[in-house]
Amino acid sequence: MPLKATDDQFIAVWTRLKKPREVSQELGITLRATMDRRRAVEAKYGIHLPTKGSSNFKGWQSEKGKKLSKLAEQRARRYEVEINDTLKDGVVLIASDAHYWPGIVTVAHEAFCRLAKQLSPQMVILNGDVFDGARISRHARIMWEKQPLVKDEIGTVQDRCAEIERAAGKAKLIRTIGNHDARFENYLSGRVGEFEEMTGMTLLDYLPRWRAGWVVHLNKETESWLTIRHRPVSGGIHASYNSTLRAGVSYVHGHLHKLQVTPWADYRGRRYGVDTGTLAEPYGPQFNYCEAGPVNWASGFAVVTFVGGKMLQPELCVVEHGKAWFRGKEV
């Protein structure tokens, strides 16, 4: 094992050994560095790395370690209102509305994973509605349609997100809360509120590596300010245009499944409204409520590139004729 282990290597070693001293010996680092690294990894991914036995390291744990421990504990159990970050150079992959369904792996999802490997993004953002929640919707079941169990949906969401995690490498993993995602906690909080804060009562528990919140701001208060949020600022046929116009910054949203980029320019420069479409198939079983009517939707996702702190025009990967296309080539 190299002296400078990656996060994945550290997690694998800790999971196997579960003893700080043995982990430190295998990695060739001090015991204090091992514990500080553990807390840093827990805070970064919102996970808990358990310790075997009853060893107590509080006597020597650094102040930094204590702060990281507290941060990990908080992040593992809560959503953030705003997620703020900066990016000077690199790629951000943004997809939304996967509505992952048991037994279905879409062309768009496979393309998302392939481009995550090819482009080595700095960030991967799932912009809401990874979960569908068909059986726990406030809307009535349509006739006798077959709907998957919640546990099967959750398992599928975990499988698909794990595929993205493996493909994304060292990229930061972020997801925003969509209205379908909220169905999970809404259903539980309204019916079994006494179980609040117990393990398994939030989607955070099932996707621990993903930082989660309502909105993401990149390069806030700069000319390349980019906001990513599930819902558009304004709906309708001109939603992406109105969203960047009213937000005053480049604005990426999901929810409407259209997949389009709308530029807008004024005295402050050029900015963009982006609808990230859907990772699902537009006529998939998740959308039976459309009653087989035509939908102005498209399967695909967005790719945003920053160079020298400047945001370039967002690009789209679109599924057409059964294949995913990006920059004129099949993915």
Regions found by a protein language model. Give the residues of each.
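Short, amphipathic alpha-helical "recognition" segments used to contact nucleic acids or chromatin
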Residues: 2-19
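Short, basic interhelical loop/turn and adjoining N-cap
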Residues: 21, 25-42
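Short Lys/Arg-enriched helix C-cap and helix-to-coil transition segments
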Residues: 43-74
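Mobile, glycine- and charge-enriched loop segments
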Residues: 66-106, 221
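Core catalytic region of metal-dependent phosphoesterases/phosphodiesterases
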Residues: 80, 95, 100-207
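Polar, enzyme-active/binding microenvironments
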Residues: 86-91, 118, 315-331
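Active-site-proximal loop/helix segment associated with metal-binding centers of metalloenzymes
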Residues: 192-222, 256, 274-283
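Conserved beta-sheet core of the metallophosphoesterase superfamily
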Residues: 224-317
